Amino acid sequence: MNFRPRLIHLRPKHSSRTRLIISFFLGAFLAVACQSTKTADTDLTTQTLAKINFADWIIVSELESQALLYLEQEPLKLGSIGSAILEKDPLNLIGRLALSKFYSSLGTIETGTDFKESYEESIRIISESGNGSPEKPWVVSSNQVAELFLKDRGISRVGGVYQSNLQQKLGLMILGLEGVNTRPQEYYFDLSHLLNSANAYLSTDKTQDSDNPWPLLRLLSESRDSAAQAAIGAYLVKQKNYKSAINWLTASAQQDNLFAHTLLARIFWSQFSGIEQMLRSDRDESTLTAENRESLRSQLNDLKTKSQSHHRQAISLGSVESMYTLGRLLFEGKFGPGKVIEGQELLEQSGKLGNAESFLFLAHHYRFGSIVRKDISRSTTFFSQAAKLRNPEAIVAFARFLISPAGEGFREEEQFGIVKLLEELVAEKEPEAMVVLGNLSAAGVQTDQSFRRAISWYKKAVKAVSNNIDEASDEIINEVAWILATTSKRSLKRARYALRIIDKRMQDSTLAREKPEFLDTWAAALAANGQFEKAIEIQKQAISK
């Protein structure tokens, strides 16, 4: 008789229809923020993983979970567990460490050392199977082994999700923290080698693809595997089946999965915003009944509270994204008045952990003073902090700020190093950085004034985008043409060049021809070249837009 071990079924409630839908779609494609990855080297897979049948793998997986619970506090319980694991899977990482700790706790140092050495050999083999990137994931035999492997490197797991794509049929992305005051990083693993044996054992449909991840993911989710629950939840979000998605993600979040918490926070806030917009659009009370409006209003506070709660739980797990998002919402008064200070604290915390957007957000608000009192000095500090994180948007924004009248009092500050930061972007072929370097050279800000150097930077920027027809490239050409056509500095003016580049762009780009600011530039370039009648005609088109 073929004995089939069963896992404990703990899953969120969902209808049989929903389950059928999930089974059908997920078998074809599991759309959960996947990234392109390469299949692990088969030789390394053979070295890393013992050839065990899937029924034994299920038992080993359960034992691995038990062993992880006892590793630190109750090593005497590890003897029977470790032995049972290695009996079925002799190369198992967790089994080897379990027996190492068990024998060491008994004072049997030599035996404990032998198992410790075999454990370290397993660690080495996994390390050599990849580098933890999406392109070269580490090959492991289970979610639990991946967690222990990271723990051996001083990385604490705070979340994760299974992923699937054409190159890697079953991957695992784990979010981990390395030390205190750090932001979670992504670590990638490959478990695709499990699928053939898993599907042969689990699937009743023998015509089903042998590398379909769904049967195994369903089994894992029913065994309270948080990453599997998160994967199903994320897939259902993609399908806009939010009710079922929330059930699965909630089950995952209950096990402190940062990925699930952040996704739930976004879902609840999206639902809140949708209802708020619906009520705002129905101010004349022509569509919704009074009863419907009251029902919708009653949901608003609940959705806001849930979103905030999940953001805070994600923050407790180290989420920099939730620090930024919740900080911004509090700062903007979305959760009521008097939350600006708390919001700014979260934003600054997020910025110090590497989120340049947080510093940039504060820089803009202190520059214009819409929510807080205008403070150019603080704005400059936040711009500088954002730029030093080497965020391209922040570097460009800070440079433009220094050139603007608002930044005039801080232009001579040498510690900013903005030119060096822009040159780093230029090395990465960033055309907007070239334009801004031209602006700095033309104005003599943070560098010596040189019109020749400015023109050189402008032409390099135009050359970099001349073959691209897109909005960003349009903007580069429009800015350069405007500067060189309208400048009052004779040594900088290049009217014919400005007309040539804007003429060509207006011929090539349909989008540019529809924008009044581009028509303004075209008219200015025509006027600078003495073509006044055509300039007036184009200017009229701009006004009519």
What are these regions (language model features)?
Residues 35-79, 139-222:
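N-terminal alpha-helical interaction modules that lie
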Residues 91, 223-225, 255-258, 264, ...:
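Short helix-capping/linker turns of helical repeat alpha-solenoids
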Residues 50-72, 471-513, 517:
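Alpha-helical adaptor scaffolds
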Residues 50-128:
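Alpha-helical protein-protein interaction scaffolds
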Residues 210, 239-247, 274-280, 297-310, ...:
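Structural signature of tandem alpha-helical TPR/SEL1-like repeats
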Residues 229-238, 265-275, 286-294, 298, ...:
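Hydrophobic face of amphipathic alpha-helices that form TPR/SEL1-like repeat modules
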Residues 104-125, 455-462, 532-544:
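TPR/TPR-like (Sel1-like) alpha-helical repeat modules
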